[in-house]
């Protein structure tokens, strides 16, 4: 109760992709959300020592936050399993034996579930930060960092079926998510995409700016500064930040208990 504003700089809920899906949900195009899935694969070899052997779900907000943000819920319970083995040097730091963890979360409505898979070490995969949201009218799937996402839509009418009358016809469409610069002050709109700043004294030298984490940075800055000016809580306030972080912490606790259910604390 300091009277100050605190905001978690959660890049994953302000990416092109997440803002696009939020728009689909707000327009009712996805319909009823049935299931959500998040992934984050990243090899952390060579990073500072405090990363070595970190439990995967202790740094899982990139995979968890879009799911909770888009569902408008917090996670209430979790079952999680760890997978694989790591060299002893990595296990020693945190007592964590797992390079990969997969969690299934029950959301607070008691009906919706979400799963998250996170890896940090000794797993041969390119960098991936992606999520999927499955609705009863339309679904969105983004599986690979630099690939375009897709939407899947039921054709109109419950009687539209595939050959043999089994299963409804579903269309698949590649989507290109807009950067939503129009909702930002004009002065910072350019930072949603990458551009080069040239050094006039060294024409061959330049520095890349903007576009980080799929255009999220200016949206985060705008939300935080606006919350101060407007004297309100920011979108990712302390309680939301705690919800997103605790989900991963409790997920790892479940993994260390061989998948036992762990109840996630409520902080409000």
Predicted regions and their residues:
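A contiguous active-site-proximal alpha/beta segment in oxidoreductase catalytic domains
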Residues: 1-49, 53-56
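Contiguous beta-strand/loop segments that form the cofactor/metal-binding neighborhood of enzyme cores
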Residues: 58-179, 208-210, 217-234, 249-252, ...
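Alpha-helix-centered segments that form part of catalytic cores
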Residues: 186-220
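Conserved alpha/beta-hydrolase "acid-adjacent" motif
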Residues: 236-238
């Amino acid at each position: 109760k300091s009277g100050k504003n605190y905001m978690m700089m959660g890049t994953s809920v302000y990416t092109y992709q997440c803002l696009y899906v939020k728009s689909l949900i707000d327009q009712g195009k996805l319909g009823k959300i049935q299931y959500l899935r998040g992934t984050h694969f990243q090899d952390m070899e060579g990073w500072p020592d405090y990363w070595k052997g970190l439990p995967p779900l202790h740094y899982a907000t990139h995979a968890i936050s879009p799911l909770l943000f888009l569902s408008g819920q917090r996670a209430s319970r979790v079952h999680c399993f760890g997978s694989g083995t790591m060299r002893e040097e990595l296990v020693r730091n945190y007592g964590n034996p797992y390079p990969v963890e997969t969690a299934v979360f029950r959301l607070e409505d008691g009906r919706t579930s979400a799963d998250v898979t996170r890896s940090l070490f000794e797993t041969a995969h390119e960098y991936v930060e992606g999520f999927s949201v499955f609705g009863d009218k339309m679904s969105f799937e983004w599986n690979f960092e630099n690939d375009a996402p897709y939407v899947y839509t039921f054709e109109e009418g419950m009687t539209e079926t595939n050959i043999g009358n089994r299963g409804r016809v579903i269309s698949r469409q590649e989507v290109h998510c807009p950067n939503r610069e129009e909702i930002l002050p004009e002065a910072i709109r350019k930072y949603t995409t990458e551009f080069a700043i040239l050094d006039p004294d060294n024409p061959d030298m330049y520095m890349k700016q903007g576009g980080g984490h799929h255009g999220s940075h200016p949206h985060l800055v705008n939300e935080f500064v606006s919350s101060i000016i407007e004297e309100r809580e920011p979108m990712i306030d302390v309680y939301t930040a705690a919800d997103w972080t605790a989900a991963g912490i409790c997920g790892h606790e479940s993994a260390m208990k061989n998948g036992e259910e762990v109840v996630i604390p409520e902080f409000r």
